[in-house]
């Protein structure tokens, strides 16, 4: 777990920085595809702003500190306020994010299977979304302000043609149908394909960061 998690933005881009003992140890930057300094992170005002914050100095850029991070394992959902949310190692699973940016309350579910569970198991799409939604409202989120983003649903059995094996597609359909039924606006999604994903959510601006196992990073 990082000592500090920072979100820094300017007119051109934005980045999440994970730190340890006031040192930048990892970053996710929206400019990574076009950045001339991605190997050395030199001459970057976004990096400079993060370093200045860690040294207690003021910056002209927008710098926000998050209150920790939460990671949902398979069949789990996690809820927090002003925290970085993560689901890692998604194949056919779906990472579902619900958030109320006005309060900073957000949740993330690691959905394993489509449909609902009679016993309330959060590994099922409908059950996870319903329970997470209600728990967020109890925590103080505003029902009419909650929005959704989700990613995952890869076709891990790419050589199989049987529909029953297309669990990624079925998961994505189940997630979307549940959100529509709940009247939760879907702001972004990234589903399908044959590649695994890690998903990170930043509650400050509502960004979903999708990192493919092949290295590509999307900010949605």
From Swiss-Prot:
Ranges in coiled-coil conformation: none
Record's keyword annotation contains Transmembrane helix: no
Pfam families tied to this protein: CheD
GO BP terms, alphabetized: chemotaxis
Keyword Hydrolase among record annotations: yes
Reaction(s) catalysed (UniProt annotation): L-glutaminyl-[protein] + H2O = L-glutamyl-[protein] + NH4(+)
Enzyme superclass (EC): hydrolase
An example Gene Ontology molecular-function term: protein-glutamine glutaminase activity
The organism's place on the tree of life at top rank: Archaea
Keywords: Chemotaxis, Hydrolase
EC number: 3.5.1.44
Entry's family note: Belongs to the CheD family.
Task performed by this protein: Probably deamidates glutamine residues to glutamate on methyl-accepting chemotaxis receptors (MCPs), playing an important role in chemotaxis.
Protein name: Probable chemoreceptor glutamine deamidase CheD 2
Organism per entry: Methanosarcina acetivorans (strain ATCC 35395 / DSM 2834 / JCM 12185 / C2A)
Gene name tied to this protein: cheD2
């Amino acid at each position: 777990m990082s000592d500090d998690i920072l979100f820094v933005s300017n007119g051109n881009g934005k980045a999440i920085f994970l730190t340890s003992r006031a040192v930048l140890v990892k970053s996710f930057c929206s400019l990574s595809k076009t950045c001339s300094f991605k190997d050395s992170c030199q001459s970057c005002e976004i990096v400079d702003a993060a370093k200045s914050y860690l040294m207690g100095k003021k910056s002209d850029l927008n710098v926000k500190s998050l209150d920790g991070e939460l990671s949902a394992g398979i069949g789990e959902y996690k809820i927090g306020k002003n925290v970085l949310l993560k689901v890692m190692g998604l194949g056919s699973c779906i990472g579902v994010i619900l958030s109320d940016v006005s309060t900073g309350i957000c949740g993330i579910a690691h959905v394993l299977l489509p449909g609902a569970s009679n016993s309330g198991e959060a590994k099922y799409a409908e059950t996870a979304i319903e329970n997470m939604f209600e728990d967020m409202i109890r925590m103080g989120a505003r029902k009419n302000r909650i929005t959704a983003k989700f990613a995952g649903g890869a076709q891990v059995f790419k050589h199989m043609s049987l529909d029953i094996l297309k669990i990624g597609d079925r998961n994505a359909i189940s997630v979307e149908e549940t959100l529509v039924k709940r009247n939760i606006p879907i702001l972004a999604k990234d589903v399908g394909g044959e590649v695994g994903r890690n998903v990170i959510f930043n509650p400050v601006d509502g960004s979903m960061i999708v990192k493919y196992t092949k290295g590509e990073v999307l900010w949605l």
